[in-house]
Design a protein with these regions (language model features):
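Oxidoreductase and adenylate-handling cofactor-binding alpha/beta cores
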Residues: 125-141, 156-167
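Conserved small/polar residues in nucleotide/adenosyl-binding loops
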Residues: 189-191
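Beta-loop-alpha module in the N-terminal Rossmann-like domain of NAD(P)-dependent dehydrogenases
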Residues: 53, 60-82, 94-98
Length: 191
């Protein structure tokens, strides 16, 4: 069996680290990068890869790894699954995962593809570790502490608000599963 040809859809922080992981994986080959701007202003580190606006411009893609904002995942995944290309995403809105699973599952089955959803940190690998520890100590007390660190999803959500030029959301742990969210906003008000 040959290498798995993967396309990275989106080239922000997650896309950059996805590319780095693919480059380190001996069983994967980078099919290309899909960016809103395509090859326009192509970063130097992408010189050896096809950079396109539409995944249809790439050849023989086995899987698309969606490194897009969470709220864009369903739209991109449906378009890509309809091409018969498998998808992996890190969708992280916990309350909408069941609906996303249903929606993408139907599309994937209709086009003989597979959709792996919420395969990021939380939900994702952190959820698996938490479930494993709860199975080992079912009467124990389980806390999940996050941070300190940048909350990319919350930062993206605030940036989507009209009038916000830039935003940074930080997660600050307090302990016992409780955290604070600090949001810094740069807004340009025209006088």
């Amino acid at each position: 069996m040959g290498k798995i040809r993967a396309a990275v859809v989106g080239y922000g922080n997650i896309g950059k680290f996805t590319l780095e992981a693919l480059e380190a994986a001996s069983d994967f080959e980078v099919a290309g990068i899909v960016r809103r701007n395509g090859a326009e202003n192509k970063p130097a580190e992408l010189a050896n890869y096809p950079v396109v606006k539409d995944i249809k411009e790439l050849e023989n893609v086995d899987v698309a790894i969606l490194a897009t904002p969470t709220r864009s995942v369903e739209k991109y995944a449906k378009e890509i699954l309809a091409l018969g290309i498998n998808t992996v995403d890190s969708f992280d809105i916990h309350t909408q995962i069941t609906d996303l699973r249903r929606s993408l599952g139907e599309t994937a089955k209709a086009h003989n593809a597979v959709s792996i959803i919420s395969a990021g940190w939380d939900p994702g690998s952190d959820s698996v570790v938490r479930a494993l520890l709860q199975a080992i100590a079912p009467k124990g007390i389980t806390y999940t502490n996050f941070g300190p660190g940048r909350s990319m999803g919350h930062s993206v959500a605030v940036r989507a608000i009209a009038g916000v030029k830039d935003a940074l959301s930080m997660t600050i742990p307090v302990g016992t599963g409780i955290h604070r969210r600090m949001v810094y906003v740069l807004s340009l008000i025209h006088i």
